[in-house]
Amino acid sequence: MPHRYPAAKINKMPKGSVPALQQEMLRRVSKRYDDVEVIIKSTSNDGLSVTRTADKDSAKTFVQETLKDTWESADEWFVR
């Protein structure tokens, strides 16, 4: 389940936060999907890709909501 996060936001993130975000997303998404891979890439545009699932719309909505919750709760899980 590849995931891309906006380059502008990634470039402004503290050192070490991209791997931490990837691990936290993996932890959260794995609760719903057994065989999951989370990939965070720095790109020039916003995008979210969800692949290898029967119900892509449902999976994409779940991942978007999970990403939003994860991003908003960074103070709780990101240790610098």
Curated annotation (Swiss-Prot):
GO terms for biological process: DNA repair; SOS response. Pfam families: DinI. Keywords: DNA damage, DNA repair. It comes from the Bacteria. Signal peptide: none annotated. This is DinI-like protein Z2083/ECs2153. The lineage of its organism: Bacteria, Pseudomonadati, Pseudomonadota, Gammaproteobacteria, Enterobacterales.
